Amino acid sequence: MSDIYLQHLMTIIVSVFLRGYRGKTVDFSITSQHHRTTVAYFLNHGKWNDSALQKALKSSIVELIYQEARSSGQPIFCIVDDTIASHIKPSSQDLHPIEAAYFHQSHLKGRQDYGHQVVSVMLSCNGITLNYAVILYDKTKSKIKIVQDIATELPEAPVISYFLCDSWYTSAGIMKSFLEKGFYTIGNRILYPMGIRQKASELALRIRKSDPNVSLVTVDKRRFYVYRYEGNLNKISNAVVLLSYPEECFGNPKALRVFISTNVSLSTQEILDSYAKRWSIELFFRQSKQKLGLDKYQIRSSQGIQRYWLIMSFTHYLCCVCKGNHCTFEEGYFYLQKQLKEERITAIYRLIQHGASLEEVLTIAG
């Protein structure tokens, strides 16, 4: 990457830590000597090798997480989910609408939402959680194929590990791809006992608290009645399915949750405790929207959008490793924000000492 492009990259990263950052080109201009359109050109049309940055980032994350698994003996969790980076639908008169934006079903909002659908992959081990990939779902490739490709590119896990997902990704093909790399699956799933299609809600109607397969389990200080089924499923041999109700909502169809584990040696408690680690990707989405401009960026080209996401993923990684050892994104974010603020104050003090003009001081102060 040329020096000028490296400057643009650092401009974007540093701007993240400014108060009020939204991922808009006007934010980049605050920390750049160049006009905001120059930084936008760097994202949309610049001739730099973004795949090299992505490859280096993925390699660093795999090395860190897999080494932690080897030294600690703890499992690796590959966590996959998707979210929507919402945007306002352009008018029919708009000559340059944002590329690759569509209407998607938002489960959070309970309606169709316009924007970009983001498939994200996190790798986690022994308390270390890093964003491995952020992928644009543009309908040229199915989400199932996107996740299968992720499974294919990951190295074989050095210890027994787990792929955590919701019902969208618990297809037999994806689970097989991950199992080949040493990852069992723990996720949501519609139940197909003994190869016969049957809704989980129908099976749940026959469950009683006194059933020998029902146990009371505590997960994150909440108690659940859980029915355990072990056997063959449609296209899956010998898996565990858990039908779960909150203790106070037993028998309420709306409260029913269904989980699957392809590792039948895990206890009910272990399955639910492992699935709870999937929360880290929801936290990542929230943090990305609040601090990395995931749903506020104003970039029109598909290439520019994917490059922006890559830089934000790199920024997330920097926050998690910036203190010399691993920390949470929030800890690293505020640490770097404080460091940059102290550096700016020091620069202002030195300018004043050397008799700088008011205009020069105001420029540094931003």
Please describe what each predicted stretch is.
Residues 84, 217, 268-299:
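Short amphipathic alpha-helical "interface-anchor" segments enriched in bulky aromatics
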